[in-house]
Amino acid sequence: MAERGGDGGESERFNPGELRMAQQQALRFRGPAPPPNAVMRGPPPLMRPPPPFGMMRGPPPPPRPPFGRPPFDPNMPPMPPPGGIPPPMGPPHLQRPPFMPPPMSSMPPPPGMMFPPGMPPVTAPGTPALPPTEEIWVENKTPDGKVYYYNARTRESAWTKPDGVKVIQQSELTPMLAAQAQVQAQAQAQAQAQAQAQAQAQAQAQAQAQAQAQAQAQAQAQAQAQAQAQAQAQAQAQAQAQVQAQVQAQVQAQAVGASTPTTSSPAPAVSTSTSSSTPSSTTSTTTTATSVAQTVSTPTTQDQTPSSAVSVATPTVSVSTPAPTATPVQTVPQPHPQTLPPAVPHSVPQPTTAIPAFPPVMVPPFRVPLPGMPIPLPGVAMMQIVSCPYVKTVATTKTGVLPGMAPPIVPMIHPQVAIAASPATLAGATAVSEWTEYKTADGKTYYYNNRTLESTWEKPQELKEKEKLEEKIKEPIKEPSEEPLPMETEEEDPKEEPIKEIKEEPKEEEMTEEEKAAQKAKPVATAPIPGTPWCVVWTGDERVFFYNPTTRLSMWDRPDDLIGRADVDKIIQEPPHKKGMEELKKLRHPTPTMLSIQKWQFSMSAIKEEQELMEEINEDEPVKAKKRKRDDNKDIDSEKEAAMEAEIKAARERAIVPLEARMKQFKDMLLERGVSAFSTWEKELHKIVFDPRYLLLNPKERKQVFDQYVKTRAEEERREKKNKIMQAKEDFKKMMEEAKFNPRATFSEFAAKHAKDSRFKAIEKMKDREALFNEFVAAARKKEKEDSKTRGEKIKSDFFELLSNHHLDSQSRWSKVKDKVESDPRYKAVDSSSMREDLFKQYIEKIAKNLDSEKEKELERQARIEASLREREREVQKARSEQTKEIDREREQHKREEAIQNFKALLSDMVRSSDVSWSDTRRTLRKDHRWESGSLLEREEKEKLFNEHIEALTKKKREHFRQLLDETSAITLTSTWKEVKKIIKEDPRCIKFSSSDRKKQREFEEYIRDKYITAKADFRTLLKETKFITYRSKKLIQESDQHLKDVEKILQNDKRYLVLDCVPEERRKLIVAYVDDLDRRGPPPPPTASEPTRRSTK
């Protein structure tokens, strides 16, 4: 840190609190140095590198049911950074608006978001607390009326009423807390008196600590002087004389110019040193022969966890550590607050009054971590508090930061940072650099600012100037040493580049006005209000608002529950962050004796550093460059290994969790982080890269899910924006309706009156507001005009109704009617008498018109009636004529059918032979009287009926003749007509068939032919029915005729075989042909086989 002028700068480096702490440790621990501890405190917050990619503290845990905590996976490794992308512009916990958690539908905070084990919420200084031995639960309600219960001390909440505890109402807490406020005020007064007594005791112990420090420093200087080589003694003596002269001049200049602040004064002479050793050896801090220091060792017991190494110039606390991988960083010890209990194993010390309790999702002052985040307390091994009933100790990285933790901007307790300057910084007296150079996985170089937390690809101007200064310093000492380097016990400084002092003013100039305003508007401190779910929050611009973690509600005005409470006023008047700063300022004012001691210590430490500078100049520069390069490569390799380890771990988890669930969680992360749908992947990456859900998908799947999210979210954002605009317009219209202003008012008058209304401000553009106003005014004027018109019509209709009640006619006079109706309110509703008379005349005219129109309507009605009657008559006549025609048609049809029946009866009686003709028969039929009954029939119809009668007679005779032939058993298939004629000629059926013998013969031959065809078909059927004949029959017949005889013997039992006895040759041909056909077909298919015609063609 830069000196702020004279003694004030020295007092910052060494204050009474530090000496007091060193003295207490010296009195407490009288044994050797404690055993080494690999877990050590990291460098100061401003000297830490940027957080690795993919590692962040994470968002607040999601809502969980009461009394539940999520499982913790101790095997979860730190998430590695993605390759090729610099760190984001700010820590993850500052990338969202403060105190703006997502809506939880008015639910109380789940217990999982309460403070972790070992860190109970405590009250702010001066606020009343509840009885520590009594567990009290408070019944409260959410805005929507749901009842829930919360612990008045731990803020733990539940939906169900707890058993076995005291439950009170919210209103009962106020008198209880008011009574306890007085008791606590007395306790505070006693605590202040004790603190003053302790301060006096510590001041007395400072002199003893200084004397011990001088004795130890002299002993170490003598031991080191004897170990130095004789060849280097003269060179070091000469260099020491030169350095002492320079240091004395600097000390005198500082003493003379104490009142003139400088920005380029040397850094405080507080250095860090490390030594290399095997895993079994230890690392200890050493000083040169001219340095004066006092070593105070802190032993540890078997039950205690070794604390981190802390070393200062005066007094120096030296701790031996094995730490093969961790580099011990020496810092000035901080005095523990009065209320800070000592550290015990497996616990994190928490102040009871110095650090207030905080609601979930709020950034506490001094970066008090939330559950799952490390607590960087000075002098205490870093531990990670997880959401389960145990504390896990986590090893720190080389930078002293826990894996996955972003560097905090403000330390919890302001430490006096001891910065070891390199030779270049001592020679140039430059400030600590804000920028640090890093490399991505693919080798690209980027630069990170430790203060503003921003990163850039281009090299900052500050680093360019620093490199130029280093080159100028190295120019006169570029002669390489050819002599072999002697073996040394101390390890060279592993720093990559000289560290400059911190410059405050240039950093402030780099920030823009908007960034400064945003920085000031962020919350810096908070204090809970006992007995209520509300907390008081202070911002950087000295503003105060109230936050309810139960309902996730923030408001500038004081809630109704807190109005009239004196303890709330006291909390607001005494901000905890300001009180802590005042106490820190008091500790920084030293006594005159201390200033003289500090000046002497500063001169001795400066001589030591100058001697180390001369030794380092004589060393081989190429060797240092190689070592620095190896260290850089080791850092890069370690980062790559961490990234690969995290990727492997994430790949294992991806193999367990289904892709759909991982994609859903990734989309939820994009939505929670406020990723814009109208931006690119590269611009939005810094919002999500530190979220643990970022590694749920591989790079390709992340890009695909992001593209899908952008497509869907873009439409949703447009819809939300449109709905928001519509809602704002509706609210603006509602505001104008509630205003009830005159429609003739101007927009300027309206805007001046309602400019402070939130609904007025919701419409961003003044042009849109004026357009909505003009539209509303136009609608109001139109409505007013319509109302006026409607009101006039109503008055007119009421006046006409009044006149109609008096049964006026066209002969009525206004002078007579006026006297009858002037007392009626409907008469008075008309404004003027002239308008009343005009309305009367209109009514009389209307009556006259109504009379004329009624007469016309009556005439028209009569004409319509007559026309309808005539039309009906025509329709009736038409229907009647159609019915008559139908009846006549049916009558004629009936007569025709009757005539046909009579004619057929006549033909049946008169025509008995089928050999007669129509011409001959017609003469005979004419003589019968029934001939006249068929007069309705035409000649062609009569002839047609005659031919049908003759065909029926012929068919009947033929059937009888064939029946005769069937009954004649002597007839065979080979019989002739001559043979048969002799047999049947005497039968009446043969005689009636026909008188022509040729006709009978032709009919007989046709009968024999039909019978022969039928006999052959029946015989084929018989062969198919005979199972004895198979496809093997032909082969058997060829071998022997006996098989054929057997077949014939079997067939002889059937009549169908015997019918063909007259043609045995033809019968045998049929048998042989059937056997050949079976042989050609071969074996029959199985019963389950389909027929060839039904087989599939596929």
Curated annotation (Swiss-Prot):
Gene3D superfamilies: 2.20.70.10, FF domain. GO terms for molecular function: identical protein binding; RNA binding; RNA polymerase binding; RNA polymerase II-specific DNA-binding transcription factor binding; transcription coactivator activity; transcription coregulator activity; transcription corepressor activity; transcription elongation factor activity. The modification Phosphoserine is found at S11, S638, S834, S933. Residues 659-712, 725-779, 791-846, 896-952, 954-1010, 1012-1077 form the FF domain. Its main location: nucleus. Binds formin. Interacts (via the second WW domain) with TREX1 (via proline-rich region). Binds RNA polymerase II, HD and SF1. Transcription factor that binds RNA polymerase II and inhibits the elongation of transcripts from target promoters. Regulates transcription elongation in a TATA box-dependent manner. Necessary for TAT-dependent activation of the human immunodeficiency virus type 1 (HIV-1) promoter. Residues 131-164, 429-462, 528-561 form the WW domain. The modification Omega-N-methylarginine is found at R20. There is a cross-link at K503, K507, K608 (Glycyl lysine isopeptide (Lys-Gly) (interchain with G-Cter in SUMO2)). PROSITE patterns: FF (PS51676), WW_DOMAIN_1 (PS01159), WW_DOMAIN_2 (PS50020). It comes from Homo sapiens (Human). GO terms for biological process: mRNA processing; negative regulation of transcription by RNA polymerase II; negative regulation of transcription elongation by RNA polymerase II; positive regulation of transcription by RNA polymerase II; positive regulation of transcription elongation by RNA polymerase II; RNA splicing. This is Transcription elongation regulator 1. Pfam families: FF, WW, WW_TCERG1. Residues 184-244, 606-655, 844-906 form a coiled coil. The modification Asymmetric dimethylarginine is found at R28, R30, R41, R48. The keyword Cell inner membrane does not apply. The gene is TCERG1.
